[in-house]
Amino acid sequence: MGCSAHLVVHGGNELLLAAAVDRLRELESWWSRFREDSDITLANRRAGLPTEVHEDTLAVVARAMLAWRQTAGKFDITTLPAVLAAGYTHSATTHQPAPDLGTRRIGLGALVAVDYEAGTLTVPPGGAIDLGGIGKGFAADLVAEELVEAGATGALVNLGGDIALVGSPSDAPSWHLGIDDPRATGTHVATLRMACGGIATSGTTVRRWQHDDGTTTHHLIDPATGRPASYGIRTITVMAADAATAESFTTAAMTMTPTDAIAMIQKFGLAALVVTDDHQVLTTPTFEEFRA
């Protein structure tokens, strides 16, 4: 999934931790757009035709389609062609190039089809999908839940800043987390206390690169324009019942103005903190419930 992983397991053992790492590698092998043999690449190559994929792949794509509906298309997994056009063509960790899919279109989110009975995923003709805006959160949720089901009393799974919290730590009633401040490296803009759930952060400061002409850009695409979003948000952190929801809503929020993003988050009863391009900090009223 092109990121670092950090796992904290309470009440478990090294075997549980090793199994969780293997599980993350398995999910990445199915979902990475940089692998020739992943479910996502195979489905993209067969755009317009049903492709047999793993059950977890069907589940994460179905969850992505729910997020597409909830955000009125602001979250859209069919923006991969625009992501590639913007320059995000190689894995940030392995530097492996993404498979060449030829010319594809964006904005086809309504046409992605999941068939649980047949076990197939159909990418729209002429389209291509990428789970970059939800896959890490969904994987964190799965692995954290599986750790607790296997006997751990608490699990924290952090995949590139998208975090799932299940159960509780053995030395405290809740988990304590810090939100990095993009205005001052090495500092926190806020510290949080969460009993369980998910937290995710999106922003324009990490997946960012420079073109030959000296201009810089990032990977967060506005489905309405096909271009990297630039509406005034530098970073946004969302707290939700699970990490997949938090991640998909942070991705959608990046395609909106700070005010509109806060309004959307409030509409769904979530909590958020926004740091704007002009260094303001905005929060939803519900954010104060999590502040440590």
Regions from the language model: what does each represent?
Residues 1-292:
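Mature catalytic core of soluble alpha/beta enzymes
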